Amino acid sequence: MRYLAALLAVTVLISPLPAQQRRMAPKHYTYVIVHGAWGGGWDWLAIDSMLTGRGHKVVRVTLTGLGERHHLASPNIGLDTHIDDVVNKILWDNLRDVVLVGHSYGGMVITGVVDRIPDRIKRVVYLDALLPDSGESVMSIPDTARAKFVQSVTRDGYLVPVWVQDTTVIPRDVPQSLRTFTDTLRLVNPARRKVAAAYILTYEPQVTPDPFQMFADRAAGRGWPVYKMVSDHLPERTHRAELVALLERVP
């Protein structure tokens, strides 16, 4: 009798969840995150840990010449090199159904990635990012303030803003090849338009005009959902919990 009772208890414990509970189980995604200019995958370590702790898979790509790969820096590194970095990581790790997230300059990169391998991408998410059309470069997109800034920090083929000049700190932002800002993006694959996309605009109410509002408007014009969160341009540092919640909501 005791044996039968124990067997029934075990049966209850291993019985499958009711259908309603199974439907409510959280979905887990594969995120590939592309950082912004001067940065590196290191800047997304905390976000990686938070998403991984919630059951997701996270791949942080560091673009050639930046972050822990700054020893490969060269003024010959261009936009295509950075697109190749992400494409090859996805292919070599055999990743599929990827939620591809690009922050800031990373928007240039992920646009090229979706054009190359749309079949591997579940959704592309632009996080306060550049959203280029074919034939555009970072520098060709109209923005007088950006053009003046780039001109003021260009040295010997690199972009060297003041905050990257302290070489005693690790990890840190590092100089980036100017060519990554001047190379033109060429989009040739119409299948990229079938990939779901979304835009996240971070904004500070006291900052107007917002330099990324034009890209949120582009996204809205394409019929994409646009999400807004109050934050500075670096939510991966300053508003981590809110960013993780929004990244989970978007897919």
Stretches found by the model and what they are:
Residues 62, 98-99, 122-125:
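Residue in the alpha/beta-hydrolase core beta-strand immediately N-terminal to the catalytic nucleophile
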Residues 203-230, 234-237, 242, 247-250:
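Conserved loop-alpha-helix segment in the C-terminal half of the alpha/beta-hydrolase fold
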Residues 101-102, 106, 110:
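Gly/Ala-rich beta-loop-alpha elbow adjacent to hydrolase catalytic centers
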Residues 57, 65-98, 115-116, 141-143:
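Active-site loop/oxyanion-hole signature of alpha/beta-hydrolase fold enzymes
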Residues 171-190, 211:
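Active-site nucleophile elbow and catalytic-triad environment of alpha/beta-hydrolase enzymes
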Residues 26-68:
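Conserved HGGG/HGGXW glycine-rich cap/lid loop of the alpha/beta-hydrolase fold
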Residues 75, 115, 119-121, 125-159, ...:
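Flexible "cap/lid" loop of the alpha/beta hydrolase fold
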Residues 5-15:
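Bacterial N-terminal signal peptides
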